[in-house]
């Protein structure tokens, strides 16, 4: 089966999440992901001001990734080494993603699991209640969404 690299972006205010499963964690791949995440969030009227990442090479040393951050007009921040809780919202989302999507059931293939991601992510963003959001889904914190999109 090989490995899948799950790339995640979570909005700090709303907890709205964007996820892609990609073949690697190279700088150019991560930069492409960030650009697409920026377009996703822009579609909801969310401007990316800061990008917080861990200290992996693809984030810290990649010119492509730094260029993508600059294109968004954002500032890049790094977590303190060996302190993933610094990026707690994304780390908590990763746990939810693993428990409720990736390992929630047995898939026949990685492709089947990846194919199930859009529906799961829609449910997460639009319907899943969050304790930190008073039992409301992330989309409820996004004020620029037409009612038909909820």
Where would I find each of the regions flagged by the language model?
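Mobile-element integrase/transposase regions
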Residues: 1-10, 16, 32, 150
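Active-site beta-loop-alpha junctions of metal-dependent nucleic acid enzymes
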Residues: 2-3, 20-44
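Histidine-centered active-site/metal-ligand motif
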Residues: 7, 76, 130
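Buried hydrophobic side chains on well-structured beta-strands
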Residues: 15, 51-53
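Short small-residue beta-strand/loop micro-motif enriched in glycine and branched aliphatics
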Residues: 16-20, 77-79
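Residue-level detector of anion-binding/catalytic polar loops
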Residues: 47, 75
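RNase H-like two-metal-ion nuclease catalytic core shared by retroviral integrases
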Residues: 53-57, 62-69, 76-99, 111-119, ...
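C-terminal domain-tail junction helix/linker
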Residues: 70-72, 96-150
